[in-house]
Amino acid sequence: ATKTVPKELLPVVDTPGIELIAEEAAACGAQRLAVVVAPNKEEIMRHFGEFSDLQELMVSRGKQAQADKVARANGLIEAVAVTQDEPLGLGHAVGCAEEALDDDEDAVAVMLPDDLVLPVGVMDKMVAVRNELGGSVLCAFNVSREEVFNYGVFDVEDAQAEIDGVEVLKVRGMVEKPAVE
């Protein structure tokens, strides 16, 4: 972790996590990205700003690839900030983002830049499942019994569906970070 750079801006190889999220959302057809930020972390939104002076300087020095990298985030998606005044958890953050939705928007994806799912393309598959079946779609993976205390654990039943190569299960219940028994 870091004390000076928000974790959302930490690079995964050479691209900040928040930019990877924006890229995947845009690739799935999203028009806007509501970024939930704490009052002291609004600088995260600067990443989606325009830096024409820096780009021009890089181009003048023959660094076109770097200039393109600087411009990339600004052209991916419209990013809007939503402030979460108190850190009251992920559910509260999602509720805060509701204010950014337009009346005709009925689908929301919760994407966390510090919890990347690889390979890229999982969101495309989730969109395909929602388009086919409707409702809420969650991405889950198996963990060893010894690791369950780190995760929310689902009780599932077979939905007898496979969409876009993905096994679809129906969630019956969930326990957040259970003790190993």
Q: Which residues fall in each region the model found?
A:
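Short loop/turn motifs at secondary-structure junctions
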Residues: 29-31, 104, 132, 170
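Catalytic-core segments of class I nucleotidyltransferases/pyrophosphorylases
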Residues: 109, 127-131, 159-181
